[in-house]
Amino acid sequence: MATPDQDVRNRKINPEARMELKEHLREFRDRLIKAAIATIIAAIIGTVFLYQPFIEMISAPLQQINIETGRRANLNYGSVASPFDQLLKVGMYIGLVIASPVWLYQALRFLLPALHTKEKKYLFGFLTASIFAFACGVAISYFTLPGVVYALLKFTPVNESNYIDAGVYISFILKFVVTFSCAFIIPVILVGINMLGLIRGKTILKSWRWVVVLVAVIAALTAPGSDIMMMFVLMAPLLIFFFAAIGICMINDKRRDRKLAKLAQGSDEASLNTATSSEDLAKMGYFEEEKTS
């Protein structure tokens, strides 16, 4: 019985080779198992070595509010099993992040044999741009998160304490980072849609007001602080990414228009250099005109 790697090698040797549905499903299952094993190993490593630094990092704004304002803000684990539950939850998320290269590698090994060279080039370009955009979103959210938490905690009344449920707080942190980071991928998706010819850059540019409104809503949802400057700090990089994507779309449109113009010009020249057949001349009435003359 052929293994998935043997199937891939066979398809490299013979690009026109076809796999049965059962073989596709077996290869998909094996690659999914490999990615899952990598995630479990990465989750164990993340739980042992990275869980405590992660908790210290997200607790830093709470300690800052304690020192600067006198308001008490602490994480609260509401049950006996809650610390262990949060340990597993955070460890799994860390494992998914660490093992993401393995997931990506297994997905590519499964998909690439079915793609042509040009499609592979587009896929690698899209993945590279998406990873870069997502990483930028993670970095920006990492630096802005303490300010967001600090601004929200300042609403705690004076001489009152804020005992935050650990599960709710960790979920808030994860949603903030993931939502803001995914927002950076939207411009990459716009470029991908433009490359497919489904939308033109000028069409997106005409809707620039809606783009600004969308970015403002995303910034307001991910940074609901009392300081309006925090919202503008988050809006700035998103707007730069969006308008850079629009510029790339317009450049791609001009390149595509030039290619289409050359193809049209070439077809016109070919038609001029081709002699008209006798059948076409007969349809045009050329021979009848000769007889009457």
UniProtKB/Swiss-Prot annotation:
What topology in the membrane does the UniProt record assign? Multi-pass membrane protein
Q: Does the keyword Cell cycle apply?
A: no
Domain of life of the organism in this record? Bacteria
Q: Where in the cell is it found?
A: Cell membrane
From the record, give the cysteines joined by S-S bonds: none
Give GO cellular component annotations, separated by semicolons.
TAT protein transport complex
**Keyword terms:** Cell membrane, Membrane, Protein transport, Translocation, Transmembrane, Transmembrane helix, Transport
- Where mainly found? membrane
Q: Which InterPro entries match?
A: TatC
Q: Which GO annotations describe the biological process of this protein?
A: intracellular protein transmembrane transport; protein transport by the Tat complex
Signal sequence span is none
- Where would you find the membrane-spanning parts of this chain? 35-55, 87-107, 123-143, 173-193, 204-224, 228-248
| Statement: the UniProt record of this protein carries the keyword Transmembrane | yes
GO MF terms listed in the record are:
proton motive force dependent protein transmembrane transporter activity
Pfam families membership: TatC
**Known NCBIfam families for this protein?**
tatC
Function description: Part of the twin-arginine translocation (Tat) system that transports large folded proteins containing a characteristic twin-arginine motif in their signal peptide across membranes. Together with TatB, TatC is part of a receptor directly interacting with Tat signal peptides.
Q: Which family does it belong to?
A: Belongs to the TatC family.
Q: How does it assemble?
A: The Tat system comprises two distinct complexes: a TatABC complex, containing multiple copies of TatA, TatB and TatC subunits, and a separate TatA complex, containing only TatA subunits. Substrates initially bind to the TatABC complex, which probably triggers association of the separate TatA complex to form the active translocon.
Return the protein name: Sec-independent protein translocase protein TatC
Tell me the organism: Rothia mucilaginosa (strain DY-18)
High-level lineage: Bacteria, Bacillati, Actinomycetota, Actinomycetes, Micrococcales
Q: Which gene encodes it?
A: tatC
